[in-house]
Amino acid sequence: MDKKKHGSHAGAHHTDEPAAETVAPAAEGAPAAADRVKELEEALAAKEAEAAANWDKFVRERADLENYRKRTQKEKEELLKYGNESLIVEILPVVDNMERALDHSDDDSASAVIEGVRMTLNMLLSTLKKFGVTVVEAEKGTPFDPAVHQAMCQVENTDVPANSVVEIFQKGYLLNERLIRPAMVSVSK
């Protein structure tokens, strides 16, 4: 019985030892596997954050590119619309001199020359109109508008309301609705 007791004890004892050995390696491997999973999860989170940052950067760059395209298209349109401005500004004094010549001429003297100047002026104004040049509205009695008129002086005048154009010294011009030269006028007090 002793042997049985010892044998059954020995068998029970012998069976417990391998089980403890089997559990021990699993217990040692579990922290290593958990650490590895944690490392992989952290690496995945970092890559996902990097991918999100790259996507945001891509979206911003695409929006910047679209804004650049729109801006360059607008600049191109502006250039086409107002590219002749410096040429037209240089031509306007010629128009002024022709108008002055007609204003100070006698209808009796040299009517053929006067008619030639008148025709030339009309052709020049017609050509300017084709390119979008229009005259600023500035007739006697027109309300003074500092956006398109330049006041050269103020005068007493009861014929027109206060702060109105009395006399036009030089016509103003618009190029496609942009002021390129204000009308020089006298204004009533």
Swiss-Prot record:
PROSITE patterns in alphabetical order: GRPE
Example GO biological process: protein folding
Pfam family membership, one: GrpE
Subcellular location(s) of the protein: Cytoplasm
GO cellular component annotations of the record: cytosol
Biased composition (Basic residues): 1-12
Residue pairs linked by disulfide bridges in the UniProt entry: none
InterPro entries tied to this protein: GrpE (IPR000740), GrpE_coiled_coil (IPR013805), GrpE_head (IPR009012)
Record function comment: Participates actively in the response to hyperosmotic and heat shock by preventing the aggregation of stress-denatured proteins, in association with DnaK and GrpE. It is the nucleotide exchange factor for DnaK and may function as a thermosensor. Unfolded proteins bind initially to DnaJ; upon interaction with the DnaJ-bound protein, DnaK hydrolyzes its bound ATP, resulting in the formation of a stable complex. GrpE releases ADP from DnaK; ATP binding to DnaK triggers the release of the substrate protein, thus completing the reaction cycle.
Subunit details: Homodimer.
Family: Belongs to the GrpE family.
UniProt protein name: Protein GrpE
Organism: Geobacter metallireducens (strain ATCC 53774 / DSM 7210 / GS-15)
